Amino acid sequence: MIPKEKELKLIKTYMYICDVYESSLKFYCQRFSNNNHPIFTDQELLTVYLFCGAYQQYFKIKDIHTFTKEYLLSWFPDLPSYQTFNYRLNLMPEAISELVRQLIHSFKPQDCDSMKSLVDSMPIITCAGKNKVGKVATEITSKGYCSTKNMYYFGIKLHAVAFRRKGTIPFPEMLILSAADENDSTVFKRECVGNLNNREIYADKIYSDIPFYKETKEYKKLELFTPVKAIKGESPEITKREKAARDLFSTAVSKVRQPIESLFNWLNEKTNIQRAMKVRSTSGLLVHTMGKIAIALITLIFN
């Protein structure tokens, strides 16, 4: 048994999942086998996963299955074995990614500033420390360097473009996964710039590309602001003369951009998304990453 308040949250989560499943999710988890209508439905599977993560703080699949078996069996009498539960969940990375897109597009807060976006990335670590070769999800992972943590790691990156919100954490507009060794600026220009117009973008120095964004400013009204990078070959006299103005500008940009770091910190605090050391497959890594994002969004939106 669970408290009445959580029963209502469970029902609310299930009803939402059923609505989204009928409109879009079912197209991402269709089956063409004899077991195309399992007794324990995909809607129930997603509800259990999201509810236990968002409201019970269980993130390990084993813990989620155990809690459901002990406390939610009256709600989900057809709960399968742990092995089947885990197998079924790992078949749903595309459905969970679509769920994240639906949550982002359907529940955009009214206080989002549509003219200002913040951009950054965070590492999702499958192995770190002394490991020299990554052996998990090698199709999508690689070795990268995290300057914030001053460490090399194997894994992927989560890139975020988020709407600025005054006085609180930004709300994500786009979320992209890439290999850890891909340059942040390259991923942003390839995956995001084409979908952005009439916008001010605030980002870190690594995104700086003056010739590229000079063009986007002209034909897309898309302007990038980053802290000032040192100019190679510039004379010391000019550097010294411009230092005060550049420092003030860099500080102003950093203040606007800082909340996206708070978004990543909040996401990691809520779900421990960065630690993916227990993952053993590509689909498992995708479920781990997008599933944790879905859990965090459910917590933010439905509370």
Which residue stretches match the model-derived regions?
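Short alpha-helical elements
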Residues: 1-303
